[in-house]
Design a protein with these regions (language model features):
Chain C
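Hydrophobic alpha-helical transmembrane segments of polytopic membrane proteins
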Residues: 115-141, 194-200
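Aromatic-anchored segments of alpha-helical transmembrane domains
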Residues: 23-31, 94-102, 149-160
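Terminal transmembrane helical anchor/hairpin motif
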Residues: 144-211
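Short, hydrophobic transmembrane alpha-helix segments
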Residues: 28-40
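Hydrophobic alpha-helical transmembrane segments that constitute the membrane-spanning cores
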Residues: 83-109
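Long, hydrophobic alpha-helical segments
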Residues: 40-63
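Helix-loop-helix units of permease transmembrane domains in multi-pass membrane transporters
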Residues: 57-90
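Aromatic- and glycine-rich beta-strand/loop motifs that create alpha-glucan
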Residues: 1-20
Length: 291, 253, 211
């Protein structure tokens, strides 16, 4: 059984922008990644999922509850971290998480301490929000989402702006949470985060679902097609761009190293390397619908 | 109910923790005492200053207007700030209703205003009681103080807190400031008089005359009191109505 | 000129609409208010100067501007930015105030137009200067307006202070308070001189450093 089921979700804003166009996919237990460019519709989709925004059409079921008719049941089961959250600077860390806990109907202060412990913020619980670093604020944001032990955690770009150490710490928190048969939806730009923790993912492009399924399957799309070519100058690079999707270019003192997806096998002599999720993602975003 | 109480409690705590709250309180107390401290010079200048009820009456016309003006500013972004900081989205995604959220904000603001306004009067009355050069029974101070808490502070707190929390969520906060400044200047420009006072006076309307009356004019303008009370409570309550009606304010359930 | 144009664009349409709304309201008051009210004095010496200060506090934000750090770090001169922003807002408000004065004069003829301008300028300049000073000090929104509002209200409420010698020379609303000794022109000049001193201080302090 799936924990989240989205069927034909569409949303068009008043200015005519189609944010979501007929999106359907399912999410089971574990960490689910949501990838896409800026403006691809990730935040709109998450807002619809947490009942903040009403889609124009389609249906969403969360833990078996219909979002339209049983919104309260859905909200009881969801922990949410919005993309931009400043919180109340005058409150202490404990007070803020306790405030959110009480709004969720959780009145046991131990639960607040447990959530703070999970994000390693218990020792800073008396510190004012306004005195925290960016990484610490994000951890408090995650703590408020974790409080009350929700079945589903929805995180909108939680790692943006965090240093690598904080990101590793964050991935640890997610993995620990996901262990207990929970579902996490993680929207991010950072492919590394998705690669490290997500078994399944969805890729959105301009409001449309481009891919939904296992991360490994997405990688399989480009497996055997990733090649590294060494060239002397940029003119050669332009020629390559005409025949293949360029993933990355590294400039060295003598020439350039180009990583490509050689879909039509135009470069049979080039060195083959194993594909990564980033290769698959950039290929999806860079190009063709038949990927 | 507990969720509503939580919103009220935290709204109250957050406001009380602001340094500006204590700045406004201190400024209004100092200004009131500069005008009405029972010093020799002031006692010679102000005829009835030895009477505790007159001192409280006078405090309500002077420093109280400054206090309410400051509180109005401090309350004016309580809903807008949730929108700006992303907190509104977070709260909307939680199992809390629009009624709980709005009532929490309004009542939290009301209790905060009532607290600060009561502290303002209490501090002034205490300083007066300690400093007045004649013996005054404590009850002589407590009776008009208690009367003021019910007759004046209560409706004024409803007015200030409700309009300051509700209106800036509906109109541009800066337009609200402009409109409020016109109202406050009308209040500041109205001279004290034994005659019937304009209904729109916030702290120095006819309601105030229930605390102290000039011995030469011992009559009460009942309709003036009613108009003043109706204005304060009515405007407060009416300004909250659009919040409940505005669909854009909350998620579509 | 280009910077003024940019500042006007940042200012946006909202303040213009609010000012236009105020002009309409004042016109209606001018038409319907009785003869007992001297609208020119209360309007242009007391109310509009504070409205100018509100506009400077709310639309002429400096440290409370979200982009302050970026501008302070990269701008050629902080003080010129402060000046452009504050002057643009003040001039915009003053334009509408003068328009309102012309209408009120046409309807009521209480005070000559040039006198109204003189009456308005000194308290408006003083309150706006104090607001700019607050804008340079406070990083939180609305605090400047709050501080100036309390000063304005206090000035209004402390008319009784005029019993002390010399206070009439620096009292903000001298005409509204009666001007018993007929010194309002001196009063206005003194207030403008005080503003000039404050501005000199601002320019000296903020002209040297960029933050």
């Amino acid at each position: 059984m799936y924990n989240i089921e989205l069927r034909n979700i569409s949303k068009c804003y008043k200015n005519g922008v189609v944010a979501l166009d007929n999106i359907s996919f399912n999410v089971k237990n574990g960490v689910f990644g949501l990838l896409g460019h800026n403006g691809a519709g990730k935040t709109t989709l998450l807002k619809a999922l947490v009942t903040v925004l009403k889609p124009d059409s389609g249906s969403i079921k969360v833990c078996g509850y219909d979002l339209k008719s049983q919104g309260d049941e859905v909200r009881k089961r969801i922990g949410y971290l919005p993309q931009e959250l400043s919180m109340y600077p005058s409150l202490s860390v404990f007070d803020f998480v306790n405030y959110m806990a009480q709004i969720k109907g959780v009145y046991d202060k131990n639960q607040v301490n447990i959530a703070l412990q999970q994000v390693e913020m218990l020792e800073f619980s008396k510190r004012k929000i306004g005195q925290l670093s960016g990484g610490m604020k994000r951890r408090v944001g995650i703590a408020q989402a974790l409080v009350g032990n929700p079945e589903i955690l929805v995180l909108d770009e939680p790692t943006s702006g965090l240093d690598p150490e904080e990101r590793v710490r964050f991935r640890g928190i997610l993995s620990r949470f996901a262990k207990d048969d929970k579902t996490i939806i993680l929207s991010t730009h950072i492919i590394e985060d998705v690669y490290q923790v997500c078994e399944e993912l969805a890729v959105l492009r301009k409001g449309r679902l481009f891919y939904a399924g296992a991360s490994a399957d997405l990688i399989n799309h480009v497996e055997g097609k990733i090649k590294v070519i060494k060239i002397d100058n940029e003119n050669q690079l332009f020629d390559i761009q005409k025949q293949a999707v360029v993933i990355s270019t590294t400039y060295a003192s003598k020439g350039l190293t180009v990583r490509i997806v050689d879909k039509n096998m135009n470069f049979p002599g080039a060195e083959s390397v194993s594909a990564t999720l980033e290769d698959a993602y950039v290929y999806c975003m860079g190009g063709k619908n038949d990927a | 109910m507990r969720k509503l109480l939580s919103v009220i409690y935290y709204e109250y705590v957050m406001q009380l923790k602001r340094i500006a709250t204590w700045g406004v309180l201190a400024a209004s107390v100092v200004i009131t005492l500069l005008d009405g401290f029972p010093s020799e010079k002031n006692l010679a200048r102000i005829e009835f200053l030895l009477q505790p009820s007159y001192f409280i009456y006078r405090s309500l016309s002077f420093g109280a207007l400054i206090a309410t003006f400051g509180l109005m500013f401090l309350l004016s972004n309580r809903m807008a700030i949730d929108h700006k900081t992303g907190m509104k989205q977070l709260i909307m995604a939680s199992p809390i209703t629009k009624l709980q959220y709005i009532f929490g904000k309004l009542l939290g603001g009301f209790i905060y205003t009532y607290t600060v306004f009561s502290l303002f009067l209490a501090l002034n009355t205490l300083v007066f009681y300690v400093s007045v050069p004649i013996d005054i029974a404590l009850t002589d101070c407590l009776v008009p103080f208690s009367k003021a808490l019910i007759i004046n502070v209560l409706p004024v707190s409803i007015f200030i807190s409700f309009i300051s929390v509700a209106l800036p969520a509906i109109v541009d906060v800066r337009l609200f400031y402009v409109l409020a400044s016109v109202l406050f200047i009308l209040n500041a420009a109205s001279p004290d008089s034994a005659d019937k006072m304009p209904f729109y006076l916030i702290t120095s309307g006819d309601l105030k005359k229930l605390i102290w009356q000039h011995p030469k004019f011992p009559y009460i303008n009942t309709d003036g009191i009613q108009a003043n009370l109706l204005f304060l409570i009515g405007c407060g309550l009416i300004s909250a109505v659009p919040l409940f009606l505005r669909r854009k304010l909350w998620r579509n359930d | 000129m280009k910077q003024i144009k940019s500042e006007l664009m940042i200012l946006g349409i909202n303040p213009i609409l609010i000012l236009a709304f105020l002009v309409v309201v004042f016109t209606l008051i001018a038409i319907f208010a009785g003869e007992m009210l001297n609208l020119s004095l209360i309007g242009f010496e007391v109310i509009f100067p504070f409205i100018a200060a509100i506009f400077i506090g709310e639309w002429g934000k400096i440290k409370a501007d979200d982009n302050y750090d970026m501008i302070a770090a990269q701008g050629k001169s902080l003080i010129s930015w402060v000046l452009y922003r504050s002057v643009t807002v003040f001039a915009t408000v003053t334009f509408f105030v003068v328009l309102c004065m012309a209408i009120v004069f046409h309807i009521r003829s209480e005070i000559p137009l040039q006198e109204m301008i003189l009456i308005y300028l000194s308290p408006a300049f003083m309150l706006s200067t104090l607001t700019v000073l607050c804008n340079l000090i406070f990083t939180h929104e609305h605090v400047s307006t709050l501080v100036c509002g309390m000063i304005w209200l206090l000035a209004m409420l402390s008319k009784s202070m005029l019993r002390y010698p010399m206070t009439e020379y620096i009292y903000l609303f001298i005409r509204y308070s009666g001007d018993r000794n007929g010194i309002w022109l001196i009063n206005k000049s003194v207030i403008i001189a005080i503003c000039a001193v404050i501005w000199t201080g601002i320019c000296l302090v903020y002209g040297k450093k960029n933050r």
